[in-house]
A protein has these predicted regions:
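Sec-dependent N-terminal signal peptides of Gram-positive bacterial secreted proteins and lipoproteins
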Residues: 3-25
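Beta-propeller-forming repeat regions
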Residues: 20-219
Length: 219
């Protein structure tokens, strides 16, 4: 517990200095797909979604702002396509489609659904050390309500590994074990801020320690 507390303090300084999220820019991994070759099938599937009532709904904050983001989520050397849409007529309007390369085409692999009206931010990090990146999604329902949901890379409709309110968060490997730990700053019912330290243990994300802050933390 003492070790977790020390890591929490170290990580907190990194989080506060970094702004909303602490990430290492990988600009080559986040770009709009080329509209040629194997990307033609991806373009066709995206066009079908738009034709059927979906609209682009790119994240509005952070370093990953494209409506379609190309990134190798599973470490196999091929990029997956992560596409962000909104379908206002659905009970869960926010949609995150994941397409995987299959030979000379892209096939739909998973759809993440959210009840919020807006995706605030998205980040990708391997939190459990299995070589697959989890998807960290910041939802925003109003000017003062934010929720963080973390999804695994799994087929179908992935269920969140963790859902919580937050003001800021950071993911970084604080103890050198090859896994990304998670720091989340949030406010309680008395508007007092605290930072929670999460680590992957026994098949799930667990809150290891918590530190109350002397003042609230604005977004």
């Amino acid at each position: 517990m003492k070790r977790a507390g020390k890591l929490l303090v170290i990580g907190l300084f990194s989080l506060l200095l970094s702004g909303c999220m602490f990430t290492t820019p990988e600009t080559s991994l986040y770009r709009l797909p080329k509209l040629a070759g194997e990307y033609e099938s991806l373009e066709s599937q995206i066009d079908a979604l738009l034709t059927n009532g979906a609209e682009y709904a790119a994240p509005t904050s952070g370093s990953n702002l494209q409506s379609v983001q190309m990134i190798d989520l599973d470490g196999d050397g091929s990029e997956e396509a992560v596409a962000f849409f909104r379908r206002t007529s659905d009970k869960k309007p926010m949609k995150i489609y994941i397409f995987k390369a299959d030979g000379d085409s892209y096939e739909r692999y998973a759809v993440i659904e959210g009840a919020s009206s807006q995706i605030y931010s998205v980040n990708y990090a391997d939190l459990d050390g299995d070589g697959l990146k989890e998807i960290l999604v910041g939802y925003k329902s109003s000017s003062d309500v934010q929720g963080l949901a973390i999804y695994p890379l799994s087929p179908g409709t992935p269920e969140s590994l963790l859902t919580t309110g937050y003001s800021r968060y950071a993911n970084l490997d604080m103890n050198g074990d090859g896994k990304q730990e998670l720091l989340i700053i949030c406010s309680d019912e008395e508007s007092t801020a605290r930072v929670d330290y999460y680590d992957w243990d026994d098949g799930a994300l667990h809150a290891k320690s918590s530190l109350r802050l002397s003042a609230s933390v604005a977004e």
